[in-house]
């Protein structure tokens, strides 16, 4: 990284020994080693962040490519759908117009509920052969039309 050879490192050590002396040289070497480790760690972190950003940018590019592909696919599907709609309207227009046969009118069926002492019985069309208790006399029996609708 710094292109320092063994000879240059040896010269640097001798100069440091002469300037600092044997007492302060170990403390200075420890201090320089800590700073070297910190700088190396910072450089490593920066390289990792750059690698992550590059991977993230590659991922973003891949995602954008996929979105573009999906957009193109959606456009082709829309075009095909329009072609199908156009063909179906043309086919309907080509068919001769026939009068629509009216369906027989369906009258809603009326449900009549008869009250027996035990249960309420639907579709009871026969008269009851029993005497209703007093508590059922106040109850008004009504018939109503019921339409069934199915939601799809």
Curated annotation (Swiss-Prot):
InterPro entries named among the record's database cross-references: TatA/B/E (IPR003369), TatB (IPR018448)
Membrane topology, as annotated: Single-pass membrane protein
The organism's place on the tree of life at top rank: Bacteria
Pfam family, one: TatA_B_E
Subcellular location: Cell inner membrane
Gene Ontology CC terms: TAT protein transport complex
Keyword annotations of the record: Cell inner membrane, Cell membrane, Membrane, Protein transport, Translocation, Transmembrane, Transmembrane helix, Transport
GO biological process assignments: protein transport by the Tat complex
A GO molecular-function descriptor: protein transmembrane transporter activity
Transmembrane regions: 1-21
Main location per the UniProt record: membrane
Family indicated by similarity: Belongs to the TatB family.
Primary role: Part of the twin-arginine translocation (Tat) system that transports large folded proteins containing a characteristic twin-arginine motif in their signal peptide across membranes. Together with TatC, TatB is part of a receptor directly interacting with Tat signal peptides. TatB may form an oligomeric binding site that transiently accommodates folded Tat precursor proteins before their translocation.
Assembly and interaction partners: The Tat system comprises two distinct complexes: a TatABC complex, containing multiple copies of TatA, TatB and TatC subunits, and a separate TatA complex, containing only TatA subunits. Substrates initially bind to the TatABC complex, which probably triggers association of the separate TatA complex to form the active translocon.
PANTHER family: SEC-INDEPENDENT PROTEIN TRANSLOCASE PROTEIN TATA, CHLOROPLASTIC
Name the record gives this protein: Sec-independent protein translocase protein TatB
Annotated source species: Acinetobacter baylyi (strain ATCC 33305 / BD413 / ADP1)
């Amino acid at each position: 990284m710094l292109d320092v050879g063994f000879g240059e490192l040896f010269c640097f050590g001798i100069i440091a020994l002469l300037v600092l002396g044997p007492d302060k040289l170990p403390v200075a070497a420890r201090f320089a080693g800590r700073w070297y480790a910190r700088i190396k760690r910072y450089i490593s972190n920066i390289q990792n962040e750059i690698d992550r950003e590059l991977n993230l940018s590659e991922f973003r590019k891949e995602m954008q490519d996929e979105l573009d592909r999906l957009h193109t696919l959606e456009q082709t599907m829309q075009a095909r759908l329009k072609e199908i709609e156009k063909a179906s309207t043309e086919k309907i227009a080509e068919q001769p117009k026939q009068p629509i046969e009216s369906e027989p009118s369906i009258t809603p069926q009326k449900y009549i509920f008869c009250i027996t002492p035990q249960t309420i019985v639907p579709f009871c069309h026969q008269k009851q052969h029993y005497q209703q208790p007093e508590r059922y006399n106040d109850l008004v029996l009504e018939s109503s039309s019921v339409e069934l609708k199915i939601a799809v």
